[in-house]
Amino acid sequence: MRQSYRYASGAVVRRTLKGLRKLILCQDLRQDIRHLVRSYADMNISLPVSAPPGWRLDFVEFEDIFGSAAVTDGPETPWGQLICCEESLESLGVLQFSTTVLPRVHGPRSSSEDEDSDDDDFFVYVEEIEPPSQARLVLLLGRYETVWCLDRDCGVLYYLAHSLDDFARHGLLHCEAIYGEQMRTPLLTTQPDHIICDLRLHDNSISELQRVTCRYRGECVPLRTPGEMTRPLLLCGQAENLKGVWPFICMETEQFNDLLKFFVDRLCCETMIMGVVGESLPSGVFHADFVILVDRACEFFYFDVSRREIWRLADSVDMLLTVGLLKIYQAGRRFHYAVDDAERLEVPGRCPHENFPFWDRFGTVERVRASTRHHELRYKWLIRKDRFIVRPDWCSMRNSLDEVSGTADVSWDPRIRPDYPQTSDLECAKQYWQELNDHVREQTARYGPVRRYSVWCGMSSRLERAVKRLQQRIPRQNLMNPSLMNQGLCVYYSDEEEDQEEDDTSDDDDQEKETENPQNNIGSLTRTPSSPGSLEGVEERMLNVMKEAVAEQDRKKTQKKHKIDTAQRRVLTRRAARAAVLEGRPTPKPTMPHPVSYLPFWM
């Protein structure tokens, strides 16, 4: 799904762009960017982010964040193993949240007063900045104004915006990293309150969550996403409730059972269908776009009906009620390791550098001098005073705040530009574009993916055993014939067999540890017992009994937690093994009914 055009008011967007003016003008020279960041850091200057309120960018140098020993170029950079291409990113500073330091807010404006003056104060001068070495989020600037965000705690790189104008219009509202548990972001979806309270109180196990969902099946929850419109979430609870919505209402029994097998095969554990997100049509049929699934650990996933894929949606009920469908809007903008993405069922990062050859389509961008580029003209065009003016009396007037924007405002998308080659022009221009791509590849080595994104690169001994076990169970004809893989790999996992194999390997590990550390049992052998008749001996025995009872309770809690962690670890290993086996092969997708299947035969 495509984002809305902006999440902030016109005055806030223009103020943010004015704060980024010098970055827009000096973006071609890395030394100028570093000098500008150094000068801002010396003055303790911070730039308020347009959305959400309270966030600001503290300009800090690279050495103050990562240390003087950190590398600024190449694969040894803090983000070198995460970014898809070998592009040099420049650190702008750290992102901080504070409710005390806010920008100067103007009073309410009318449509004519939205033309803010040029003397607005778009910077914040902070007296005390938190230690940048302990900051979690780092803002980075790439080529052609691409904006990136590095989450140092999770080791994840986010592709925030395709330009500084995009960053000014959207801010951090769709950055997944700001909605973590430590931020305590308030819930957006709060109604109906009795349903929300029951869901939050029974999110510890999948059985309790299913019981609550079945209690309210048929109810509609307005699921809210930050900055986007509200979508209806129809609660189901059971698989049979899916047959009342489109397109599952048109599916045969065998086809529907294959779909349920696909859900279990993709999540590698028992699955609960929480509900569907879509639209209620005037005909009375609910049109489903996404199916919300819950796995054993009460983590949420979505099944895209049109793409026939399953990906991660939220880590918990609270996160689902906070971010809504944010991951669907930001699909492909999260860059991490292949094994972790396979375990979490995250959408792999989609390389945004594919459009760079389009920018260099005439082979002249690298030859043009920096002084002759039209960055100043672009900046003046972006902050023009009539850009966000709303005139209701002009019904035929269109501006850049409309959903369908002009070419100048979304020129980053090649599909919208009229000079992008269409299908009829591809054959005659194929040779020219091939020569152009070769020229671009020779000019810069940062085009094309250079990172080996493969599950096989991060193999562990546990994962290798899971891959071998999975390869032995998969029917050979399913891997050779993609048409037979509608319901997945047709593998039914057995926890008992995997427990036996893990116990065998763990026993060997325990024996090795005991042989290496024989002094663990010395204390029990050399302890001298007290005389049974003395008062001190009775008190000591009672104290020992109480300690043993408390230790037994703690041991049971630890075993229960370890059992849950082991079960979840087993599920994650299954997902990574499944991704490793299917790497380089067609992805299994279930068969879904087409519009022809539910239309009358005369149509």
Swiss-Prot record:
This is Protein US26. Belongs to the herpesviridae US22 family. Residues 496-536, 549-568 are annotated as: Disordered. Pfam families: US22. It comes from Human cytomegalovirus (strain Merlin). InterPro entries: US22-like. Residues 517-533 have a biased composition (Polar residues). Residues 496-513 have a biased composition (Acidic residues).
